[in-house]
Amino acid sequence: MRLSQFHLHTTKETPADAELVSHRLMLRAGMIRKLASGLYTWSPLGLRVLRKVEAIVREEMNRAGAVEVLFPTIQPRELWDATGRWEKFGGQLLKIKDRKEQEFCYTPTAEEAAAEFARQEINSYKQLPLNFYQIQTKFRDEIRPRFGVMRAREFLMKDAYSFHLTDADMAREYDNMRAAYIRIFTRLGLEFRAVQADSGAIGGDASQEFHVIAESGEDSLAFSTGSDYAANVETASAALPAPRPAAGETLQRVDTPTQKTCEDVAQLLGLPLQRTVKSIAVMTTAGFVLVLVRGDHAVNELKLAKVAGMADYRLANESEIRQHLGSEPGFLGPVQPAQPIRIIADRDVAAMADFVVGANAVGVHLTGVNWGRDLPEPETVADVRNVVDGDRASDGGELRLTRGIEVGHVFQLGSKYAEALQATVLDENGKAAVMKMGCYGIGISRIVAAAIEQNHDDAGIVWPAPMAPWKVVVCVINPKQDAQVAAAAGDLLEELIAAGIDAALDDRGLRPGAMFADMELLGVPHRVVVSERGLAAGTFEYRARTAESAENLDKAGLFSRLGN
């Protein structure tokens, strides 16, 4: 590959709306160009990186026994009506009509098409299990596309759908795909975590996300120092609290005239924030509920919604609070409410003694509160809080928080989609059985941006070697003025390629400083300079992308350094 024959257009300027490092660097390196909001053209350079990722994904999917197919990106409304997702998916589903006024959608995912294909093709349990995958563009009509290809409307995705007769076999393939994903992200050279996750709108029983670790990540993750346990903060749980200690204080009323937050009350009383309890008033269709979490903790909305009877909860308004507690926000508590109410206590609160709560009287709090003496034991005890850094993990380690970018997700869907589309097979007894289904997605274009977020410096991208557009670029000084140097550089390029090294020759004739800056911006792992001085000495100037300085190597030393 000669860069004089390759479209490479780098820039120093970055559009003001490029917020993320990956967006800025991809634009500066000329990897992508914006066509419209959330729509990007991938340049030859960007496409080389994209294809490197795609190739590794395809190899590992094939290795895992999945079979490649290609579903239409445009799918009929009838399929999506059958699963209820035509309306449920909301505004992100791009809906279109053809000339006959028939309705279709540009699909963001392909569970319906996969289940319909399975219904048409699979008749007997003897054909199972089967796992079909595709690498295909998808479209989500994001309200606010941003961050370049990180949250574009059109994106490249690998999505796979497996079909099974039993839950046990579905679980087996789920583990198989999870192992394949670990191999994929390991081969890509990325630091990542597989985390427990909520299934969200796609549904299903078991779910794991794969996150590339990056400070700019939108998701907060918790992982244990004691094992490979990791989870999205939405679903992460700490270890059970220690048993409740015995009561040691008497109940007292204290004036807190202007102290409405746990932080202010703790400061006034000279107590640790962990001794206070936060009371959150909510309403459900069944009535008023008071949710209790420790003062230094926050309610986890997802966990709370999964508590029995809480699926439809909302925050109570001031009128409802006065009716049930006879007070106002800032002074609420579970002791002697104005009316009988349901109380949900977080596990940590249920294990507390001598704690502080609002007194249900303006300007007053209670100290030395104890379960069973000053108020009944909580009706419901559940894990309803977000974990915090330093929490004790169930495996004995400590939980640490980090941030990540979701790049993959695996689900056990069960029979949800197959049942809706009547995808059945004849079982061993000749009876119709609804197939079980698994779903496994990887955001291929998103991986490219996530890798840059994790791997960059002030000069540009620092690609993991498997993702780099080239492993090495040979830079030739003054190729048009020195035919001998140009010929030597061309010979070196051919030798590198013959040795199986992915190499390119920068023969564009740029000044050395501009050429080297481009190579750093592009993140090429290795740079070799061919010059008149080096040829006279029988050496090449070599520098790794992450090295502080260059060194002179003979050809044998160069090939040794490049791993051949």
Swiss-Prot record:
Record-level Gene Ontology MF annotations: aminoacyl-tRNA deacylase activity; ATP binding; proline-tRNA ligase activity
Keyword Transferase attached: no
Keywords: Aminoacyl-tRNA synthetase, ATP-binding, Cytoplasm, Ligase, Nucleotide-binding, Protein biosynthesis
Catalyses which reaction(s): tRNA(Pro) + L-proline + ATP = L-prolyl-tRNA(Pro) + AMP + diphosphate
CDD domains registered for this protein in UniProt: ProRS-INS, ProRS_anticodon_short, ProRS_core_prok
Localization annotation: Cytoplasm
UniProt GO cellular component terms: cytosol
GO biological process: prolyl-tRNA aminoacylation
InterPro entries named among the record's database cross-references: aa-tRNA-synt_IIb, aa-tRNA-synth_II, aa-tRNA-synth_II/BPL/LPL, Anticodon-bd, Anticodon-bd_dom_sf, Pro-tRNA-ligase_IIa, Pro-tRNA-synth_IIa_bac-type, Pro-tRNA-Synthase_IIa_type1
NCBIfam families from the UniProt entry: PRK09194.1, proS_fam_II
Similarity comment text for this entry: Belongs to the class-II aminoacyl-tRNA synthetase family. ProS type 1 subfamily.
Primary role: Catalyzes the attachment of proline to tRNA(Pro) in a two-step reaction: proline is first activated by ATP to form Pro-AMP and then transferred to the acceptor end of tRNA(Pro). As ProRS can inadvertently accommodate and process non-cognate amino acids such as alanine and cysteine, to avoid such errors it has two additional distinct editing activities against alanine. One activity is designated as 'pretransfer' editing and involves the tRNA(Pro)-independent hydrolysis of activated Ala-AMP.
Description of its domains: Consists of three domains: the N-terminal catalytic domain, the editing domain and the C-terminal anticodon-binding domain.
Quaternary data: Homodimer.
Protein name: Proline--tRNA ligase
